């Protein structure tokens, strides 16, 4: 996912 969330 986008930066600040999960790596995807």
From Swiss-Prot:
<keyword id="KW-0964">Secreted</keyword>
<keyword id="KW-0800">Toxin</keyword>
<dbReference type="GO" id="GO:0042311">
    <property type="term" value="P:vasodilation"/>
</dbReference>
<comment type="similarity">
    <text>Belongs to the bradykinin-related peptide family.</text>
</comment>
<keyword id="KW-0840">Vasodilator</keyword>
<keyword id="KW-1213">G-protein coupled receptor impairing toxin</keyword>
<dbReference type="GO" id="GO:0090729">
    <property type="term" value="F:toxin activity"/>
</dbReference>
<keyword id="KW-0838">Vasoactive</keyword>
<protein>
    <recommendedName>
        <fullName>Des-Arg9-bradykinin</fullName>
    </recommendedName>
</protein>
<comment type="function">
    <text>Produces in vitro relaxation of rat arterial smooth muscle and constriction of intestinal smooth muscle. May target bradykinin receptors (BDKRB).</text>
</comment>
<dbReference type="GO" id="GO:0005576">
    <property type="term" value="C:extracellular region"/>
</dbReference>
<dbReference type="GO" id="GO:0006952">
    <property type="term" value="P:defense response"/>
</dbReference>
<keyword id="KW-0878">Amphibian defense peptide</keyword>
């Amino acid at each position: 996912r986008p930066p600040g969330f999960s790596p995807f």
